[in-house]
A protein has these predicted regions:
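Catalytic and substrate-binding regions of extracellular carbohydrate-active enzymes
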Residues: 1-186
């Protein structure tokens, strides 16, 4: 196996019997002054990549990898400008890529999912995908996974106290929002 690389070689293995496209996270040595990361696929083309954590000259990087079934490949991680990914945006209460635009309401619930291909909102107007708690759960034997119908028939309690929404990350490989809420004493 040839692991020669101009930067840090990262071996990626796909044990599955089907092709996969996935994000890979690896910790590598990068110069402390490096502001970005460039990751090269085996064909020499850059792939979407970003630095997600730093500790001096150690960096945790995230990059997009495409793998054939039951195979491995060596990716080359170097300091530099990241390969451009598909358009990813995270700002305020919105996440967006080339296919979907997701908007959160003030409670941090999903208020809208626009399918850009069809120009259609997948969430009914005035509704939202909400985080809620079903209480009390009357199951004594398997309360972690057994939810009785009587519990499901009750109105769930909303989780909408002290809501804070912030951008967790917005890079070439991944974008995300962080929603923090309080429920009871948690």
């Amino acid at each position: 196996m040839d692991t020669r690389a101009k930067g840090s070689p990262v071996l990626v293995y796909n044990p599955a019997a089907y092709s996969r496209r996935s994000l890979v996270e690896a910790t590598v040595d990068l110069p402390a002054e490096a502001e970005g990361v460039a990751v090269y696929a085996p064909d020499g083309k850059t792939v979407p990549a970003q630095i997600v954590a730093r500790d001096g000259a150690r960096a945790t990087v995230l990059f997009a990898a495409a793998m054939e079934p039951v195979s491995y490949a060596v990716y080359d991680v170097r300091a530099g400008k990241a390969g451009k990914g598909k358009v990813l945006r995270a700002s305020g209460n919105t996440l967006e890529n080339r296919v979907y635009k997701v908007t959160l309401d003030a409670n941090g619930d999903i208020a809208s999912v626009i399918d850009k291909r069809n120009g259609r909102d997948l969430v009914e107007k005035g509704k939202a995908f909400r985080l809620a708690v079903l209480t009390p759960n009357v199951s004594n034997r398997y309360p972690a996974w057994e939810i009785h119908k009587a519990t499901l028939d009750q109105t769930p309690e909303p989780v909408d106290t002290d809501v804070r929404i912030s951008v967790a990350e917005c890079g070439a490989a991944r974008a995300s929002l962080k929603v923090e809420r309080r429920y009871g004493d948690s």
